[in-house]
Amino acid sequence: VASLGKALGLTGGVIASDSNFIQEIKNYDTFVAAAGMNPAYVQTLAQTGNLVQQQLKKLQDNLNYLAQHLQPNPKINFTTNYPSIYLNWDKSNEILLKNKIVITHFNYPSDQKTLNRIVISANHQKEDLDQLVQVLNSFL
């Protein structure tokens, strides 16, 4: 699944897999909507290889930094392989907002559970990550 296209300014995504996996994910609300990619955006992306590599390195550095500083917590779902942190407790959005941290916070139509997701980017500074770590580690 390639979902970083939107992070790079593209207006669509791509899923490349075998047909069994494609059929399986069609059952999930998160994968039923689609948007075609603007060819001009794709061409621009193709011409920015060096910049993309630099940003990917910064993103991976940020993810590794978080992995080193976040304390293990069953309410925090995080891996250095994916630039999002999923939070599994009801008051997380309120607490983060009080600390001036804005997250993705919504419900999918067929899911009663609220999605609380923090998206990590290459543009986050060490100070941003330190603030996030401090707040998340205080939930222990």
How would you describe each model-predicted region?
Residues S19-I22, A33-A35, L45, T104, ...:
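Short, low-complexity, polar/charged sequence segments that are solvent-exposed and flexible
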Residues V1-Q71:
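Active-site C-terminal subdomain of aminotransferase-like
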